[in-house]
């Protein structure tokens, strides 16, 4: 089976004593879970999904950058979101497909739009995490220390770190 093959391949790669080598079996769930690229206010008790934060680069941000924290997603594909609605069921198998959502802005005005949910928020959450760490280090050090996170041992990650060290953080300790 695939799991045993993964284990055998990992053992073989280990015998090569090669750094950063590996193999893993990826489990398939049979369905995809669409994501709108937002974090929701889990303390909110009313109808709809109250947005706590819109993730930069995510589907909501890319579709309408005017959507902000405090706005409420009232419906997805014509299904009103009540306080007891399972929000995950509304986006099941919707990743990559266009859906129609209705968003009530902080002003009380509702706005409808088509949006293409993503398959994951991993990249946006990672970028958010790095940005938060950069801001925290800058604040705590008074701008003396720069923060870089090495995402991977590849050329793109090296270039990103190198660019920050010689750019944004060139005057830092």
What are these regions (language model features)?
Residues 3-8, 16:
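Extended, domain-scale alpha-helical bundle/helix-rich regions
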Residues 70:
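Conserved catalytic motifs of ABC-family nucleotide-binding domains
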Residues 26, 50-53, 59, 74, ...:
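Cleft-lining beta-strand/loop regions that shape enzyme active-site pockets
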Residues 4, 62-65, 82-83:
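Short, surface-exposed helix-loop/turn micro-motifs enriched in polar/charged residues
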Residues 11, 15-56, 61, 116, ...:
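PDZ/PDZ-like peptide-tail recognition elements
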